[in-house]
UniProtKB/Swiss-Prot annotation:
Catalysed reaction, written as an equation: Release of an N-terminal dipeptide, Xaa-Yaa-|-Zaa-, from a polypeptide, preferentially when Yaa is Pro, provided Zaa is neither Pro nor hydroxyproline
Similarity comment: family membership: Belongs to the peptidase S9B family.
Species: Metarhizium robertsii (strain ARSEF 23 / ATCC MYA-3075)
GO cellular component terms, semicolon-separated: plasma membrane; vacuolar membrane
Carbohydrate attachment residues: 355, 577, 819
GO biological process, alphabetically ordered: proteolysis
SUPFAM superfamilies in the cross-refs: alpha/beta-Hydrolases, DPP6 N-terminal domain-like
Biological function: Type IV dipeptidyl-peptidase which removes N-terminal dipeptides sequentially from polypeptides having unsubstituted N-termini provided that the penultimate residue is proline.
Membrane topology note: Single-pass type II membrane protein
Residue spans, topological domain Vacuolar: 116-915
Class of enzymatic activity (EC top level): hydrolase
One term of GO molecular function: aminopeptidase activity
Active site feature: 760, 837, 870
Record protein name field: Probable dipeptidyl-aminopeptidase B
GN (gene name): DAPB
Length: 915
């Protein structure tokens, strides 16, 4: 189950300030000193009492004179008494001089420390410090800021593109000063300060190539504006998509055109149907053909002959898909819209065939919009539009998939099966990778705990299983789907005697990188090892230098750094500064000589392009510093962040993030909002910078916001996550409750005001935690788009963690949210759902509401968003979700929901009537 948004849930980062003062000129040194005295008093109660005695004026009796009055002083007598001058004793004078000198010296020393420490600065002049223990004066974070993009860090994605001439460092830029589509060298002068050492005439930046001058083109007198583009590998043509229409999370259909770069002429991809709705189009590696899927059939457009279109399949339609995934494979397997793979030489095309004949349909009703674009028949305007999706649920028929091959020269389509591969009803194909003139396939059983790697030879039409991994026997868990398996061709001159591949493998309880060579060797050379994990590895492979680049948690489970390692497992080297905390992502150029390094936190995010150890030159250019975001962080009161590891009963350790209000006072009693996602292998507690809804709650509402990553979540080793198998939500609920009990015991927490919330899996976990807790610890909960019974979610995701319901009835029952009586023991909870959610069906919430009705439980609120899908965004609904969360939470912590638990009419006899 993917989260509702592309950016995984992010953690928070702080800033500075107290009042809305922006410069030192508006703040006196005296006020700053008193601010710091107050902070010290808050931290040390004993010092606080003595400091207050020193700061408060003494109580004066009537008739006492004021020693501090301007008219009199400490050495002056009472009013009316004449002054008498007397000579001062010489010894006493010497003592006074010494005391004065000591005082002046101490004052000067203190002033020096004050200046050198920067304490004289107003908080809004200080750099953002994510580890600060207190906040000064500044502006509060607002909801409008959070949802208006005010706190969004600017970031740039680089579309790296292979150089047909064999170079490196080329990227595709859109809407530049030179043209709409321009191929640039990443080293091209951008009027910035660079480190650009070691360049020679052979390593000078390539000149820009303009592929498309204007952001539109003309076809038969009509202006067309592209929504999507893909240059051919030889950069001589560009595939353009117009009138793009969204389908599911990743997929869309559009009308496609082919632009000739040299002549600027365009032609339709489908010559005899200019307005054809094409679902997918891909260039061949040789630039002389384009494969595309239309009406679920796959075609090839050959460009060396005019109007030459070859239809490869003919039975595509509602039941059969070719070259594109169906709903469940798009969502849960490929995480994308393509299921087509060209061989490197362009001689073969591999594609997925999906047979959905036996897959049950799920109907989604649209009450407001008509996604089909079709007008209803006359007299049927008042009926909702119904869209039926082939949606397999646990235990139901899955789509039957296999890989087919098209021989371009012979024009025939064929399939190749390996002995002992999984049968049709029990097969998931998760990876297809061309390895030279062969293909590597990954197949698993439908519950995802047995993996087979198959090597296919299309030219010989043979296949064999080269590796079988019984994950159930290794740790009782499941196979994690990834798409980073990388082919390593043989090159004896580089020490690689035979073909192989690099992939993520389970090694001693953690996910690491293994190098399999020869390609049919089931025993890898381990490139990494230890009590840490790699993420989506490898990120890139430099074949010239036998280097593998990857991102890992080697420094900390909540950080990410970038490393390289040799193919023999030696010389593991960081590319990022591991002496400082950091959360990095990275993308590499086609030959791995350059990398876009994106620093996500904990400080202000930035991006820079760097050279890698793969090339002899040194290059570094910052392309985004988010200086404006840094300035905003200085001037606003962001939460105080506390990271750590929480020790729960039975030796369980979980990462936590506690967000405190900017002016946190340990002597106060704070309510807590627990925010979580909790899904398998997810991670919410990270060192990323973020100012989001949780930041707003802590900064502006003044509540504590706590997140933990319970058992089942990622990057703490396999044993931390696979224990949840067959009983999703149960152990996670225990961890959330244990964490809440720990916080309830702290002196600064109000144990009567604890709430929990989440979206999607987080919505499920919210309700499951409230059910297990039954009001003992948590009082309130807010669940958005929740699963309530895993029998209602899709089969591929659910069965991976829960197995088949026919084999695990007790586990499905234990995971389902169905104990309405237990939910009724909480003070109140909120459920929100979109009626057109194609991912977590509205059926989930309706089933729970029926349980509540049957039990007579009424301590909840429901908000349904018409025609919204899983993101709940139709007709401005997304902001309404958070407004409702905000208002509902404030009412909860203010005790308003307690007033309506047993409402009574107002006694009309006691009302005052005004005539």
């Amino acid at each position: 189950m993917a989260p509702p948004f592309t950016d995984d849930p992010e953690s928070q980062r702080p800033s500075t300030s107290r009042l809305s003062q922006d410069s030192l000129s508006s703040v006196s040194t005296t006020s700053l000193v008193f601010d710091r005295i107050q902070e010290e008093m808050d931290r040390d109660p004993s010092a606080s009492r003595s400091a207050r005695r020193d700061l408060l004026p003494a109580t004066k009796d009537e008739g006492d004179f004021d020693e501090n009055a301007s008219e009199t002083g400490a050495f002056l007598g009472p009013p009316g008494v004449p002054l008498q001058r007397q000579p001062m004793d010489r010894g006493f004078r010497r003592i006074l001089i010494i005391i004065g000198a000591v005082f002046v010296g101490a004052w000067l020393a203190g002033l020096g420390i004050f200046v050198l420490s920067g304490s004289y600065k107003h908080e809004s002049d200080s750099e953002h410090d994510p580890d600060a223990n207190s906040r000064g004066s500044g502006k509060a974070v607002t909801m409008d800021q959070v949802f208006g993009g005010f706190w969004s860090a600017r970031s740039h994605s680089i579309s790296w593109i292979a150089d047909p001439d064999g170079g490196d460092g080329l990227l595709l830029e859109v809407n530049t000063a030179n043209g709409y589509l321009v191929v640039e060298d990443v080293r091209a002068d951008k009027e910035s300060t660079d480190t650009n050492a070691g360049q020679t005439a052979d390593t000078q930046p390539a000149k820009p190539r303009v592929l498309m001058r204007d952001p539109y083109f003309m076809y038969h007198g009509e202006i067309k504006r592209p929504d999507w583009n893909e240059p051919s590998p030889d950069l001589k043509k560009v595939l353009l998509a117009v009138k793009r229409e969204k389908n599911w999370r990743h997929s869309f259909q559009a009308t496609y055109f082919i632009l000739d770069v040299e002549t600027a002429q365009v032609q339709p991809l489908v010559p005899d149907n200019v307005n054809a709705k094409v679902q997918l189009a891909n260039w061949s590696p040789t630039s002389d053909a384009i494969s595309f899927t239309m009406d679920n059939n796959i075609y090839i457009r050959r460009l060396n002959q005019a109007n030459d279109v070859v239809q490869i399949t003919k039975d595509g339609g509602p039941e059969y898909f070719y070259g594109i995934p169906d709903w469940v494979y798009e969502e849960e397997v490929f995480a994308g819209r393509s299921a087509t793979w060209w061989s490197d030489d362009g001689k073969y095309l591999a594609f997925l065939r999906t047979n959905e004949t036996a897959v049950p349909e799920y109907a989604i009703e649209y009450y407001i919009q008509r996604p089909s674009g079709k007008k209803p028949a006359v007299g049927e305007e008042a009926y909702p539009e119904i869209r039926k999706i082939k949606y397999p649920k646990p235990g139901a028929h899955n789509p039957v998939v296999d890989v087919q091959y098209y021989d371009v020269s012979k024009g025939d389509v064929f399939s190749i099966s390996a002995p002992d591969e999984f049968p049709d009803h029990d097969r998931i194909i998760s990876n297809v990778l061309w390895a030279g003139n062969k293909v590597l396939l990954k197949q698993s059983n439908r519950i995802g705990d047995f993996l087979k790697v198959i090597l296919v030879d299309p030219s010989q039409r043979e296949a064999k299983i080269v590796n079988s991994i019984n994950i159930a026997e290794i740790d009782g868990g499941w196979f994690e789907i990834s798409h980073t398996m990388t082919y390593i061709p043989a090159d004896p001159s580089k020490g690689r005697q035979q073909d192989g591949y690099v992939d993520t493998v389970i090694h001693e309880g953690y996910e690491h990188i293994g190098y399999f060579t020869p390609i049919d060797n089931p025993k890898p050379i381990m490139l990494t090892s230890g009590s840490w994990e790699v993420e989506d590895a490898p990120s890139a492979v430099d074949l010239n230098n036998n280097l593998v680049y990857f991102v890992a948690t080697k420094e900390s489970s909540i950080q990410r750094h970038v490393y390289s390692v040799k193919l023999d497992g030696t010389n593991l080297t960081p590319l990022t500064n591991t002496s400082s905390e950091g959360y990095y992502t990275v993308s590499f150029s086609s030959r791995s000589g350059f990398a876009l390094l994106s620093y996500k936190g904990p400080k202000i995010p930035y991006q820079k392009v760097i050279s890698t150890p793969s090339i002899p030159i040194q290059f570094s250019r910052t392309i985004e510093d988010n200086a404006d975001l840094a300035d905003k962080a200085k001037k606003h009161e962001l939460p105080i962040l506390k990271y750590g590891t929480l020790q729960l009963p039975n030796g369980i350790s979980v990462n936590y993030l506690e967000r405190r209000p900017p002016h946190f006072n340990p002597k106060k009693k704070y309510p807590i909002l627990f925010q979580q996602y909790s899904g398998p292998k997810s991670q919410t507690v990270t060192k990323k910078f973020a100012v989001d809804f949780q930041s707003y709650v802590a900064s502006s509402l003044g509540y504590l916001v706590v997140t933990i990553d319970p058992r089942g979540t990622g990057f703490l080793g396999r044993q931390h996550r696979v224990v949840v198998r067959s009983q999703l939500g149960v152990l996670e609920a225990q961890d959330h409750i244990a964490a809440a009990k720990h916080y309830s015991s702290l002196p600064y927490v109000d144990p009567s005001r604890l709430a929990i919330w989440g979206w999607s899996y987080g919505g499920f976990q919210t309700l499951k935690t409230l059910e297990v807790d039954a009001g003992d610890t948590f009082s309130y909960g807010m669940a958005v788009a929740p699963v309530t019974d895993w029998r209602f979610y899709d089969s591929i995701y659910t069965e991976r963690y829960m197995r088949l319901p026919q084999d695990n009835t007790a586990g499905y029952d234990a995971s389902a949210v169905r104990n309405a009586t237990a939910l009724g023991m909480n003070k109140r909870f909120l459920i929100m759902h979109g009626s057109a959610d194609d991912n977590v069906h509205f059926q989930n919430s309706l089933k729970l509401l029926d349980y509540l009705d049957l039990a007579g439980i009424e301590n909840y609120d429901v908000h349904v968003f018409p025609d919204s899908d899983h993101s709940i965004a139709f007709h401005g609904a997304n902001r309404m979700v958070y407004d409702r969360l905000n208002n509902w939470l404030v009412n909860a912590f203010n005790g308003e929901w307690l007033k309506i638990a047993d409402p009574k009419p107002i006694d009309t006899k006691k009302r005052r009537h005004v005539s």
